Amino acid sequence: MWSNVISIGKEYSKEIDYILAQLQCTKDVSYATEESEQRMWIYLASSCENVQQIENEMYRILSVVFLSFLKLRFFLERLPIHCMSYAKCVLISSMLHFDEAFEENLIAKTLSDSMDYNVDGLFNFRLRMLKESWEEIADVAARLLEGSDGDKDVFDIATFIAGSEGGKSRIATDGQTIDNITQRRRVEIVRLYDESEYNLIDAIVKEKPFEIYVTNKNLSDAMRGILKKIAKVIEKI
């Protein structure tokens, strides 16, 4: 029998909701929760024959927690963003997914070397190297934002941070779901924001598309406009 435990401070309510929702959809894993006034523990168990599969899934789930939820908190605390906009969402998404492959590998290595999954403990101590790198990106973005004038400047900053790497995938969205046509898979849309279109932007930026098929006429004008700045848009309505 394989077992482990995820522990996390209860102030991270969105992170907890995400972890529990993902565990409900994970095959061959049973779990139980325990909580105190300040902390939650999620006890995990599975048969030994599925250990590698289950651990890989835990790494994937916790990678999203570290590299989307906690990274977003980190940047919002350091950037002069007083009112969110579509352009600012693109900027933050570019920052969240910058150097993502390297960071995901680092997360997996850190988790594999850990006795348990103490989320905030790992984030504050074992992953300090990541936070130092994020601090540098946040400093650059903050300086550029202070001198920005409107959404065009904000989007230019996002393009600068994302680098010159070209788009990799053709994707399609109906405003509720996203499919990566090139890789033939459904794209996960993580609920980072209360505004659903911001979550859509984050998932789209992560895919690095060169072409976006839009099949929903009900997307807002602001959303349509920002998609056209991210990649070539083809409307199929």
Could you tell me what each predicted segment is?
Residues 1-204:
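Conserved mixed alpha/beta catalytic, RNA-binding, or beta-rich assembly cores of soluble enzyme
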Residues 181-237:
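C-terminal structured domains
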